[in-house]
């Protein structure tokens, strides 16, 4: 060891354990425009001060470990460490705090959601000094977001590809989700598309099982798409699920979809992983494919109020990793989604610039600069009576996806699709005429049903169906 190295390693080094807050709690720190900012909901163990808990989160998700190490002297901790710069109590909750942490940009690999999450939501979530920990929000600085391609195409390019403007897009998940043969599956797709839907969808569970191998499904669905397009004169699509056990197999399926000339493929981005998702998004941009994203497994991560990660963070991560659509709850259907919170992350998906708004759970102002937007998909337990509310809540730049609400029609798939298309067109026309969809929605649907027997039959079947449970996702 050289004398110079000897001196650097020994000066200022004192072995042992010291409180995290001595190094990582810095309430006087002024955040930089290039910092990644995080808001954590922290529940410390009894006897652990909130400042120590917040500092521990900053340390364990950046440069710190449980004891002082001599190699700290070989780098500049001030340059690289995370800093807990503010702590506030959570209103109405005992022993819960919001800890704000700033991370210098040099901690993260460019263009890698995988690397960002490995640090920020890594081992720190198993830290013993905390009873629970939840990441509520992230501020992604433009200096970092510009290192990502983002969505393969974005909202405007998708509308131009489909030649569809001025209304939400309509979709349907084919049911039963498992067990159909490829030929019967393709027939169900055709019936829905010819009835007036823009898209049909593979269920997230459908990959390449013994009852229906992926290549057979792709071929029969492509046949259904082209047949429905010829009959209706509209561009149609089916979300062909390319999710697979390996990245290589996933790309092989996307290549086959491109060779068939279909417009869109699909990926389960959480079970598939961010590395696979980003690879697929790059392929889709290079080859003109739209990319639909399903969020299977999200509730394992985001449903508990005091531990895990809020979906708004997963939504931001998806916009960076890449996807043209993502499921975002419905507010009115069978799946979780409180209105103001849902609209908060819908704006984070679609808009270029979103102001901080704690009433909607948005902890930081987010500037996406030129990153394309993502269409939110409302799906899960919705039917024609929900159409006015969905049109009013989500607006034009959305996909409204009715699975059982199409296939459960008493007359079959095509009449179910007709009912949904008629209901949507009636709601859009009423809105454009200045009518109040929230107050007059049922009246608008009843009026349209008078000249659409398909809609009238759907209204009768689902007039009593409600999913009324208290939302778990509250502020």
UniProtKB/Swiss-Prot annotation:
Pfam families reported for this sequence: RuBisCO_large, RuBisCO_large_N
Reactions this protein catalyses: 2 (2R)-3-phosphoglycerate + 2 H(+) = D-ribulose 1,5-bisphosphate + CO2 + H2O; D-ribulose 1,5-bisphosphate + O2 = 2-phosphoglycolate + (2R)-3-phosphoglycerate + 2 H(+)
EC code(s) of this entry: 4.1.1.39
Record PTM N6-carboxylysine, positions in chain: 201
A Gene Ontology term for the protein's cellular component: chloroplast
Cofactor note: Binds 1 Mg(2+) ion per subunit.
Cofactor dependence: Mg(2+)
InterPro entries: RuBisCO, RuBisCo_large_chain_AS, RuBisCO_lsu_C, RuBisCO_lsu_C_sf, RuBisCO_lsu_fd_N, RuBisCO_lsu_N_sf, RuBisCO_lsuI
Binding residues for Mg(2+): 201, 203-204
Catalytic center residues: 175, 294
N6,N6,N6-trimethyllysine: residues carrying this PTM: 14
Keyword flag Electron transport: no
Annotated residues for binding of substrate: 123, 173, 177, 295, 327, 379
Transition state stabilizer (site feature) positions: 334
Alphabetic keyword roster: Acetylation, Calvin cycle, Carbon dioxide fixation, Chloroplast, Disulfide bond, Lyase, Magnesium, Metal-binding, Methylation, Monooxygenase, Oxidoreductase, Photorespiration, Photosynthesis, Plastid
Molecular function via GO: magnesium ion binding; monooxygenase activity; ribulose-bisphosphate carboxylase activity
Prodomain positions: 1-2
GO biological process: photorespiration; reductive pentose-phosphate cycle
Compartment(s): Plastid, Chloroplast
Chain positions found as N-acetylproline: 3
Oligomeric form and interacting partners: Heterohexadecamer of 8 large chains and 8 small chains; disulfide-linked. The disulfide link is formed within the large subunit homodimers.
Miscellaneous note of the record: The basic functional RuBisCO is composed of a large chain homodimer in a 'head-to-tail' conformation. In form I RuBisCO this homodimer is arranged in a barrel-like tetramer with the small subunits forming a tetrameric 'cap' on each end of the 'barrel'.
PANTHER family: RIBULOSE BISPHOSPHATE CARBOXYLASE (PTHR42704), RIBULOSE BISPHOSPHATE CARBOXYLASE LARGE CHAIN (PTHR42704:SF15)
Protein name: Ribulose bisphosphate carboxylase large chain
Source lineage: Eukaryota, Viridiplantae, Streptophyta, Embryophyta, Tracheophyta
Gene assigned in the entry: rbcL
């Amino acid at each position: 060891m050289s004398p110079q190295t000897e001196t650097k390693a020994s000066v200022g080094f004192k072995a042992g354990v010291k409180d995290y807050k001595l190094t990582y709690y810095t309430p006087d720190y002024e955040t930089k425009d290039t910092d990644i900012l995080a808001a954590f909901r922290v529940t410390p163990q009894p006897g652990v001060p909130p400042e120590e808990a917040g500092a521990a989160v900053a340390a364990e998700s950046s440069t710190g470990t449980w004891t002082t190490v001599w190699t700290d002297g070989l780098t500049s901790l001030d340059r690289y460490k995370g800093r807990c710069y503010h702590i506030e109590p959570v209103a109405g909750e005992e022993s819960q705090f919001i800890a704000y942490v700033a991370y210098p940009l040099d901690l993260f690999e460019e263009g890698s959601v995988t690397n960002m999450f490995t640090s920020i939501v890594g081992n720190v979530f198993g830290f013993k000094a905390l009873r629970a920990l939840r990441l509520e929000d992230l501020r992604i600085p433009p200096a970092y977001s510009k290192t990502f391609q983002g969505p393969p195409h974005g909202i405007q390019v998708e509308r131009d590809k489909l030649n569809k403007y001025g209304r939400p897009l309509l979709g349907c998940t084919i049911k039963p989700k498992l067990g159909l043969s490829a030929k019967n599956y393709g027939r169900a797709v055709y019936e829905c598309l010819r009835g007036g839907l823009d898209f049909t969808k593979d269920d997230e569970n459908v990959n390449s099982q013994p009852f229906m191998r992926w290549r057979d499904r792709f071929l029969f669905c492509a046949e259904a798409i082209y047949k429905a397009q010829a009959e209706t004169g509209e561009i149609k699509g089916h979300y062909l699920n390319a999710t697979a056990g390996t990245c290589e197999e996933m790309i092989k399926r996307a290549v086959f979809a491109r060779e068939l000339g279909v417009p869109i493929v699909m990926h389960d981005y959480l079970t598939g992983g961010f590395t696979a998702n980003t690879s697929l998004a790059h392929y889709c941009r290079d080859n003109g494919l739209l990319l639909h994203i399903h969020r299977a497994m999200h509730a394992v991560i985001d449903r508990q109020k005091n531990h895990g990660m809020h979906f708004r963070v997963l939504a931001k991560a998806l916009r960076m990793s890449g996807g043209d659509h993502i499921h975002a709850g419905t507010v009115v259907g069978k799946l979780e989604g409180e209105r103001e919170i849902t609209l908060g992350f819908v704006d984070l998906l679609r808009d270029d610039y979103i102001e901080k708004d704690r009433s909607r759970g948005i902890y930081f102002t987010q500037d996406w600069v030129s990153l394309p937007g993502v269409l939110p998909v409302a799906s899960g337990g919705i039917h024609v009576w929900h159409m006015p509310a969905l049109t009013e809540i989500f607006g034009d730049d959305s996909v409204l996806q009715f699975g059982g609400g199409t296939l459960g029609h008493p007359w079959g798939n095509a009449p179910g699709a007709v009912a949904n298309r008629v209901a949507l067109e009636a709601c859009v026309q009423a809105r454009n005429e200045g009518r109040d969809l929230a107050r007059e929605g049922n009246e608008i649907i009843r009026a349209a049903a008078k000249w659409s027997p398909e809609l009238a039959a759907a209204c009768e079947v689902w007039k009593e169906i409600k999913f009324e449970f208290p939302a778990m996702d509250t502020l």
